[in-house]
Regions:
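C-terminal and inter-domain tail/linker signature
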Residues: 1-119
Length: 119
C-alpha cells in the first residue's frame, strides 16, 4: 500500500471504532460524508440511516477488524460484529470508497459466524 492508501485504512478503522465501539456520533459525523451512499441491503440509506441503525443496536455491539487493505480510493475490511442481539455474531467484508479523506460509499457482505462444529 502506498502512503495515501495506508492513511485511508487508518481513517476507516478509526471511523469504525468511533461509531461501532465508542458510539461517539458527533465525532463519527466527521468521518462519514453527509452524502454517504449505502449499498447494503441490511442498512438504511445514507449516513443518518447507518447512525440510526447503530443507535438501535444493543450497547454490547463491538467491531473487531481482522484484515484491512486498500487499493486506490477503496478500503477493504474483514471483521466481526458481536453483541448484536442475535445468536451468532456477524462476519463482514466491507468495502468503503473514500473521497477527500472521508467515507463516501459502502458495500458489504454479511454472514452469520459459523461455530467450530459448523466449520
Amino acid at each position: 500500500m502506498n502512503k495515501s492508501e495506508k492513511r485511508n485504512v487508518e481513517i476507516v478503522l478509526n471511523a469504525f471504532d468511533i461509531l461501532f465501539n465508542k458510539r461517539d456520533y458527533a465525532t463519527a459525523e466527521r468521518f462519514w460524508s453527509p452524502n454517504y451512499i449505502q449499498h447494503s441491503a441490511h442498512i438504511p440509506p445514507g449516513r443518518d440511516g447507518l447512525f440510526d441503525l447503530v443507535k438501535g443496536l444493543p450497547a454490547t455491539l463491538r467491531y473487531e477488524n481482522h484484515i484491512a487493505a486498500a487499493t486506490g480510493d477503496f478500503v477493504i475490511l474483514h471483521g466481526r460484529f458481536s453483541g448484536i442481539g442475535l445468536p451468532a455474531a456477524w462476519v463482514v467484508a466491507d468495502i468503503v470508497r473514500m473521497e477527500d479523506g472521508i467515507l463516501a460509499e459502502h458495500w458489504d457482505v454479511i454472514q452469520d459466524e459459523a461455530t467450530r462444529e459448523q466449520s
